[in-house]
Amino acid sequence: MDGATLAPAKVNLFLHVGPVDGDGYHPLASLVAFADLGDRLSVEPGEALALRVTGPFAAGLADEADNLVLRALRALGDVTGTGPPPLRVTLDKHLPLAAGLGGGSADAGAALRLARRALDLDLDDAALTQIAAGIGADGPMCLFARP
């Protein structure tokens, strides 16, 4: 099975970054909303995990072999014990890189959702959320585009 989905842009309406705490991280307080625009991802069966990047902002990612989409899908393979999923992923990149719109995390979340469906994996939302959390601080909220 194959599929496609939107990876919506995350808009920070409010963001407060606190001082570094004991574990070396900054506590965050934020209020976000998700837009009706973003990147588009599609997956189809393949012989091995592969990523093709297209779109107006593809140039910044075209040579990046370890972007968040690939990291998320490799982590999914680790959790399932099957290794990297044999999927051909196309990322149609419409969000500018490093613009604070959560594009990479949204792309990773969309890839996880699509892979679960395409591979008919018996993983619940909590398991996907754990994988997304390992990708980045905004991974869980970008997974399902929910603040």
Which residues are covered by each model-predicted region?
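Catalytic-loop motifs flanking and including active-site residues across diverse enzymes
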Residues: A65, D107, C142
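Short, small-residue alpha-helix embedded
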Residues: S105-A118
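Alpha/beta catalytic cores of group-transfer enzymes, especially the acyltransferase/condensing modules
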Residues: L121-P147
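ATP-binding N-lobe of GHMP and related small-molecule kinases
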Residues: M1-A99, R117, L121, A126
